């Protein structure tokens, strides 16, 4: 939908200082790769991003512009494909990002998309560009301090995320749950009731609102995302768990996959990512 998209020209990106992060030695995009040629002919790289994750990707409600680490990264990728290629951002959630790749509506997704063995069976992931860990945010008054204190509680998670499974696995690893009924390949937060229950939401602000209203007693997702919803009346439990590596996602077998992976490796090596992470306070 056009209302969820924003065109950001590379000229504007350069004015914002994005070009200073790019390597002066630019890899030439192979025009004989059909997916890359299609982007060059179109003049637009279609990218799925979050619109509410501070530091990674946020959409300004007035200007419609996207800013953040992943938005800058998308612009750098577009610049490598072609000097005149623009970025068309589409807001996605954990529940919608993969289907928009499958349908061909997006060329790639940069949306705090965690790399897992299961997901790699269905989509291509680049080398990780950021690592985080899952944590749990609670209200101070809840007296929830540890994983074990979540027994009997309802936890808010994002639909389509891996947070619920990671939490249950951590509780099993810490011998809080016996895990007899846990199957990682078939895990479904909607039907899991052993020790802890889950309520799935379409977006993070909805989980935060539910936590404030005590509709859920905990908010579980990656720590960098939870930091956005941390207030003086909220605390993190003591444990962090399940390291989460984020990668650029493309359709399985896409000719774009190897090209993007090469760029990620180059920028990891030349210090580009270190600068971007500092710039976005991550």
What residue spans do the PLM features occupy?
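Flexible hinge/capping segments at coil-to-helix
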Residues: 38, 138-155, 178-179, 258
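Short helix-initiation/N-cap motifs at beta->coil->alpha
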Residues: 32, 87-99, 142, 181-209
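Acidic, polar ligand-binding/catalytic clefts
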Residues: 75, 79, 86-149, 233-240
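Periplasmic-binding protein-like
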Residues: 51, 130-141, 191, 223-265, ...
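Ligand-binding clefts/hinges and TM-proximal coupling segments of bilobed small-molecule sensing domains
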Residues: 28-42, 162-195, 227, 231-240, ...
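Extracytoplasmic small-molecule ligand-binding "clamshell" domains
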Residues: 27-111, 270, 275, 279
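Short loop->beta-strand "edge-of-pocket" segments that line small-molecule binding or catalytic clefts
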Residues: 44-49, 66-67, 148-178
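A ligand-binding cleft/hinge motif common to bilobed small-molecule-binding domains
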Residues: 96, 113-122, 165-169, 173-174, ...
